[in-house]
Swiss-Prot record:
The lineage of its organism: Eukaryota, Viridiplantae, Streptophyta, Embryophyta, Tracheophyta. The gene is PIMP1. It comes from Capsicum annuum (Capsicum pepper). Keywords: Cell membrane, Glycoprotein, Membrane, Plant defense, Transmembrane, Transmembrane helix. This is CASP-like protein PIMP1. Glycans are attached at N36, N129, N135. The chain crosses the membrane at residues 13-33, 58-78, 92-112, 139-159.
């Protein structure tokens, strides 16, 4: 009797998904890092930027960590494509599996914190003055969320690549 077939994902598919993840996270980083607006108040003009809010700082942190992990995984994927050998052998598959799970859910917490902060700020009186800032923050969080979906796809692929043990 032959063993059941294993489902594996071709390395180039995994590489493409990781590159798409990196692109979304990079654009999210650029959008949130450059997000600022000058608002006129009774006390004078005030420049608001992402650094003024903990949730947006958290979004930047999750995006940076996500980009670092994704760059590492892209390097490993390129190595697998060019040499045909997986770095670290079968033990690396567990790092890949757990790392993908952690990073994907870490990214969604950054996006969720940013969405929540934006929603809270929109409910404040006078939020029309800084709606451009809030909309740009939502755009960055949305890109992080799209990056999360690509990271989940990578997570599913790494689950398929685990050896089947009975």
């Amino acid at each position: 009797m032959t063993p059941p077939p294993t489902s594996t994902v071709p390395p180039y598919v995994s590489l493409i998904v990781r590159i798409l993840t990196l692109i979304c996270l990079l654009i999210s980083f650029i959008v949130i890092a450059t997000n600022n607006q000058t608002v006129s108040t009774v006390a004078g003009d005030v420049k608001i930027k992402f650094k003024d809010f903990y949730a947006y700082r958290y979004l930047i942190a999750t995006v940076i960590i996500g980009m670092a992990y994704t760059l590492l995984q892209i390097a490993f994927s390129i190595s697998l494509l060019t040499t045909g050998n997986r770095i670290g052998g079968e033990g690396f598959l567990l790092f890949d599996f757990y790392g993908d799970k952690f990073i994907s859910y870490f990214l969604v917490t950054g996006a969720a914190a940013s969405f929540g902060m934006t929603q809270d700020l929109k409910q404040l009186e006078g939020s029309d003055n800084y709606s451009k800032f809030l909309n740009t923050s939502n755009a960055a969080a949305s890109l992080c969320l799209i990056g999360f979906f690509f990271a989940v796809a990578s997570s599913i692929f790494s689950s398929y690549n685990l050896p089947k043990r009975i």
